[in-house]
């Protein structure tokens, strides 16, 4: 799917979708959904659910602060692309949410590794490690990184004091057994 955030113009975006005659689904608290050319698009009111727990509230506020500085975001055809720090924090939270509810796929681990490798030269490691620590995602991000390094055969730029090798093995087994179902 494609995730969009319209910088506070959530309702305006929904109205534009309706005006274009596209079926708009408002079944979700965090975002609306619509489909264009077979691709699901999520128009986010929030980046993550800030009301679910303290982690959600922290991550939502951290992401808002990261998106406020437009200078850190590249643009493509006039659209802002998330900064390395934004993308990393959002991905860690999003993946942890899905892992806890329905597992994640091997593709998600590969996406994590490819993303970190792509941002190798521009990610502010101290900022992202601080955010991960503050919202309780350090261990999960370390596990994702450990698995991604094993699968992709690369050393990623995000280094943790603890790699949780045994837990990473169990998580990978969960993922692989889930994919077999």
What are the functions of these language-model segments?
Residues 2-4:
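RNA/tRNA-interacting regions in translation and RNA-turnover enzymes
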Residues 6-181:
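Conserved NTP-donor binding/palm subdomain of two-metal-ion nucleotidyltransferases/polymerases, i.e.
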